[in-house]
Design a protein with these regions (language model features):
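Short, hydrophobic beta-strand elements of compact beta-sandwich sensory domains
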Residues: 1-9
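Signal-transducing coiled-coil linker helices
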Residues: 12-55, 63-73
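Conserved nucleotide-binding and Mg2+-coordinating catalytic segments in signaling enzymes
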Residues: 45-67, 83-97, 105
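Hydrophobic framework residues that shape the active-site pocket
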Residues: 88, 106-107, 129, 166
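Catalytic-core segments of nucleotide cyclases and related cyclic-nucleotide turnover enzymes
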Residues: 97, 141-148, 152, 156, ...
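Active-site-proximal alpha-helical element of nucleotidyl cyclase-like catalytic domains
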Residues: 99-118
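Short helix/loop segment flanking the catalytic signature motif in cyclic-nucleotide metabolism enzymes
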Residues: 103, 130-147
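A short pre-motif secondary-structure segment
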Residues: 120-123, 160
Length: 207
C-alpha cells in the first residue's frame, strides 16, 4: 500500500463523513420545518374549531351558522329547520340552570344523532337551534319522525323529559328572494307548533 493510496482512502472516508453529517443536518432541518408547519396547521385548525363551536353543546355556533347560510344556493335542494326547546325558562326557574343546561345538551345530542349524517346542527341562541340538511331530502319525513321518537324517549338525571318545537322549509317550495326569508318562514312555522304545544299541554308559557 503506497502513501498516496492511503491518503486517497482517508480522503474518501472524510468525504463520506462530510456527506453523512450534511444529510443528518438536512434531515434535522426538514424535520424541524415539517414539525413547525404541522404545529401551525394544528393551531389554525384549533382556532377555527373554537371560533365555530358552541362551548356548551359542541354544536356549530352562530358564527358558523352565519357563514353557512351566506354560502347556501337557493337553486339547490336543501332543508332549513328551526328548533326551539319548550319550557326551558320554567326548568331554569324551578330546577336551576344546571337542569336547563342538561336540557340544552340533550337537545343538541338528539339533533346530532338524528340529523348529523345529513347536515349540520347550529346553536344560534340560548335554546334556539337550526339544522340545515343538504343530503337525503327525500327521506326527510322518516328522519324527522326518528328525531321526535328520540326526544320522546329521552330521560335525564335532573329533568325527566324534554319537548322541542320545530318548523321546516324546503328551499324548493317556491322561489325565494333570499335565504333570510326561508329562515323567517321556518321560525314562523316553529312558533305555530310551539303555541299548539302550550295550548294542548295546558302549560303556562313563561316569557
Amino acid at each position: 500500500v503506497t502513501m498516496d493510496s492511503s491518503f486517497y482512502r482517508q480522503g474518501n472516508i472524510f468525504a463520506v463523513l462530510i456527506v453523512g453529517v450534511y444529510l443528518v443536518l438536512a434531515s434535522c432541518c426538514m424535520f424541524y420545518m415539517l414539525s413547525r408547519v404541522m404545529k401551525e396547521k394544528y393551531e389554525k385548525e384549533k382556532l377555527l374549531y373554537i371560533s365555530n363551536t358552541d362551548e356548551l353543546t359542541r354544536c356549530f355556533n352562530r358564527h358558523a351558522y352565519e357563514e353557512r347560510i351566506n354560502n347556501l344556493d337557493l337553486r339547490e335542494e336543501w332543508i332549513y329547520i328551526s328548533m326551539d326547546l319548550n319550557n326551558l325558562k320554567h326548568t331554569n326557574d324551578s330546577l336551576g340552570h344546571a337542569a336547563g343546561d342538561e336540557l340544552i345538551c340533550a337537545a343538541a345530542n338528539c339533533m346530532r344523532e338524528s340529523f348529523g349524517k345529513y347536515g349540520n346542527v347550529y346553536r344560534i341562541g340560548g335554546d334556539e337551534f337550526v339544522v340545515i340538511i343538504t343530503g337525503n331530502t327525500k327521506e326527510f319525513q322518516s328522519i324527522i319522525e326518528s328525531f321526535d321518537r328520540r326526544v320522546a324517549q329521552w330521560h335525564g338525571k335532573l329533568v325527566d323529559s324534554m319537548t322541542i318545537s320545530w318548523g321546516y322549509v324546503f328551499s324548493s317550495e317556491k322561489e325565494w328572494d333570499n335565504i333570510y326569508d326561508i329562515a323567517k318562514e321556518a321560525d314562523e312555522r316553529m312558533y305555530k307548533n310551539k303555541e299548539r304545544y302550550y295550548q294542548e299541554s295546558k302549560i303556562v308559557r313563561r316569557k
